[in-house]
């Protein structure tokens, strides 16, 4: 009997070693297995093991590295007698906390299918695996495993159900997540605040605030009290949907229930007020969070800087950046890009360019957003070659320009009188990109009109319907105004009548296009 188990272990060892190499290659490229470590692996596998896994478990797995955790699991699989499932769970949990979810799944499959090794999962094991399937965006596999665990006589609990709901939410299968949550009571599982908060958060992230509010109502009806995470998710969703009055009501509701807001709650409100130019509200919320000893995070500070820049209070924005750094909060690329835009808006172009140029020295790597801002600044300063140089730098350094990058270049070329270059680049864009939007075409139409090419611009406007791009209020306004300015009254009146009859009723725009 011992011989057959030893044979099984030997064959399984090869499988584990192959699996180890696979994950080192595919799951974590930063890990390299040294020859000495490979030797120790085989020594552990075939020499009766000199290390007692119990000692390792007793010392704790809080700071264990992936390589060591993997080897510990293999060592345990080779041990005789086999360790308990509780001990295996400890190692699987440690690996899962490293976000190596695929490793956990495959390690368990190996030991479960290994000839001569008999071990049965418990509820804790099953919950680990269900969560790992969900984290790998495989909620269907998690659901299948749920069926398997029930066949083994293991009843799922609230942790199982929460993982499943979260898994479907992560995969953006909201209907399935809602369905699973609805089936919980039939499975004998009482819903809790975690499950409903997961649903509310996902619905809000998808701008589905009405269903999110319905989930909130039903959870209250079931006697489940929302917590700070629930309210923060809801307030963030309401703010992003422009429902600031509702967001404020929820904040007051939190206060009445003695639930203290957190940095996420306040940041959502500050960001929403800043984007709508309500600086007095921004100041009020900021003071409130400081009074409650809640430290702003990088998102909060970036929103505060945006609000100040929006009102041309750039010097105050600089002070806010200095305060942020003094508080130990490191600015990110969004923070610097926001402040740079504030400089550009205040005609302090050189200051904005210098700020972005200094970013790498401050330990912040450039990205598409910062490059777009820098291109815009160079064009505003009339430094066309430098602007196009940054654009070229993006393409040669793996920073893929987005449609906004191209739109900034087109607008910059027209603004600097480089009409031919703009037309040439636009022609190239039409051949190579399929994401040209109404902003792209509006820039072209406006630029061509300013270059006395009104007929050509009108022809491009007319062709938009064949490109499946719907002109918006701004596009109609520019085209009608430029046709009038060019003396093409008949065309301008016809376009205005068409807009008033067919377009305006579907838009929330001013009543008259002049």
Swiss-Prot record:
UniProt PPR repeat ranges: 122-156, 157-191, 192-226, 227-261, 262-296, 297-331, 332-366, 367-401, 402-436, 437-471, 472-510
Keywords (A to Z) from UniProt: Repeat
Disulphide bond pairs: none
Family: Belongs to the PPR family. P subfamily.
The name this protein goes by in its record: Pentatricopeptide repeat-containing protein At4g26800
């Amino acid at each position: 009997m011992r011989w057959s188990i030893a044979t099984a272990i030997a064959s399984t060892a090869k499988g584990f070693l192959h699996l180890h190499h696979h994950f080192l290659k595919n799951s974590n490229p930063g890990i390299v297995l040294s020859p000495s470590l490979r030797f120790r692996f085989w020594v552990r596998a075939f020499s009766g093991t000199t290390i007692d896994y119990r000692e390792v478990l007793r010392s704790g797995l809080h700071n264990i590295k992936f390589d060591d955790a993997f080897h510990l699991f293999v060592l345990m699989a080779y041990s005789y007698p086999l360790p308990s499932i509780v001990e295996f769970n400890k190692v699987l949990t440690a690996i899962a906390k490293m976000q190596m979810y695929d490793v956990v799944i495959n390690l368990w499959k190996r030991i479960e299918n290994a000839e001569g090794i008999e071990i049965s999962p418990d509820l804790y094991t099953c919950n680990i695996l269900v969560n790992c399937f969900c984290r790998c965006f495989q909620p269907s596999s998690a659901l299948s495993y749920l069926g398997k665990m029930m066949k083994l006589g293991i009843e799922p609990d609230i942790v199982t159900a929460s993982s499943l709901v979260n898994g479907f939410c992560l995969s953006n299968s909201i209907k399935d997540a809602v369905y699973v949550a609805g089936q919980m009571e039939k499975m004998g599982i009482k819903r809790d605040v975690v499950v409903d908060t997961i649903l509310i958060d996902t619905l809000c992230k998808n701008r589905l605030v009405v269903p999110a509010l319905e989930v909130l109502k039903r959870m209250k009806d079931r006697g489940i009290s929302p917590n700070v995470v629930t309210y923060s998710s809801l307030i963030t969703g309401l703010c992003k949907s422009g429902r600031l009055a509702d967001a404020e009501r929820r904040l007051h509701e939190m206060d009445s229930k003695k639930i203290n807001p957190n940095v996420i709650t306040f940041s959502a409100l500050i960001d929403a007020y800043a984007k709508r130019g309500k600086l007095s509200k921004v100041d009020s919320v900021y003071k409130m969070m400081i009074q409650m000893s809640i430290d702003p995070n990088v998102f909060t500070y970036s929103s505060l800087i945006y609000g100040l820049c929006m009102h041309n209070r750039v010097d105050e924005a600089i002070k806010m950046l200095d305060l942020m750094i003094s508080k130990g909060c490191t600015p990110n690329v969004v923070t610097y890009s926001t402040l740079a835009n504030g400089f550009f808006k205040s005609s302090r172009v050189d200051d904005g360019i210098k700020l972005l140029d200094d970013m790498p020295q401050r330990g912040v790597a450039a990205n598409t957003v910062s490059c777009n801002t820098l291109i815009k600044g160079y064009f505003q300063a009339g430094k066309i070659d430098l602007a196009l140089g940054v654009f070229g730098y993006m393409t040669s350094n793996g920073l893929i320009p987005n449609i906004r990058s191209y739109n900034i270049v087109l607008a910059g070329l027209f603004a600097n009188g480089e009409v031919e270059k703009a037309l040439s680049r636009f022609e190239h864009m039409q051949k190579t990109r399929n994401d040209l939007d109404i902003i792209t075409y509006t820039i072209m139409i406006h630029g061509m009109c300013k270059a006395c090419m009104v007929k050509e611009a009108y022809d491009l406007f007319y062709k938009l319907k064949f490109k499946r791009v719907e002109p918006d209020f701004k596009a109609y306004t520019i085209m009608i105004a430029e046709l009038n300015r060019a003396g093409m009254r008949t065309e301008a009146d016809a376009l205005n009548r068409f807009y008033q009859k067919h377009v305006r009723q579907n838009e929330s725009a001013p009543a008259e296009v002049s």
